[in-house]
Amino acid sequence: MKKVIALLLGAGLLLSGFAQAAEKPLIRIGARVFTEQTVLAEITAQYLRANGFDVRVTGGLGSSLARQAQETGQLDLMWEYTGVSLVSYNHIDERMPSPEATYAKVKELDARKGLVWLKPSKFSNTYALALPSEIAREYPQVNTISQLNEVLKAEQSRKHLVALDTEFANRPDGLDGLQARYGMHLGRANIRQMDAGLVYTALRNNQVFAGLVYTTDGRLNAFKLKLLEDDKHYFPDYTAGPVIRKAVLDAHPQLAELLAPLADQLDDETMRQLNAKVDVQHQSPSSVAAAFLREHPLHEVTP
């Protein structure tokens, strides 16, 4: 009889455990097809799991597919960039006067689609022009894009090369707009179009005078590249922040409080270091995320 009771109690506890596991709220996170998105999704997933959520991550998504999946309720949470939402999803071409204005605008526009922008991070993964280390030493006076343009004009006969990824070089709001804003006159002899990853290789090997980069890319520090100030404010702001479906936030309002301190921990330099651990040191995104959460303990919120 005692054995029967023990078995029944054991079965009851087991079923209770299954029930508790089944009761964990599910959050479906999406990530686009580049390192930073994978790292952010992994950090968020591990953090939410530690706070009682069941999390599934779908990675390798294109921008349009990821957005469509979230708008149609197939994904619950994405780390999004204000400039992407403004231009690509909401088709607003006018430049906002500040990062805060950009955030406020996309928060308003996306709310109409049932999407809520939570507290933004402290990093912006926007475009920039950078110099290789040797060029930076040879031209210490070049700290801004305007100063770069002065050198390119003064030394036009030397046909200095500028590396750009193919997409940026051919977009109307890319190279053409940059040249118009800064009064640049880069011809075919000056431009080298290539895959975005090869731009960093060309810069590292000092094969070009300057190149287009992303401000939170881990290779900036690893390759000792010098970022130039966008002194005429051409490049739009791409502040990152978690965007969640309103229906999910209404069901689990503690998510806003839970994700706020995570966003506070993420600035430009932190993201460069995290991205470098994957792209340069070849660590897995999951191990990078786990190490980050160990080094930056965040408070728990019971769902």
Q: Model-derived features: where do they sit?
A:
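An extracytoplasmic/periplasmic, membrane-proximal ligand-sensing/linker region
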Residues: E36, A169-M184, P253-P303
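Short, polar/charged alpha-helical segment
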Residues: T35-D54, Q70, G177-A180
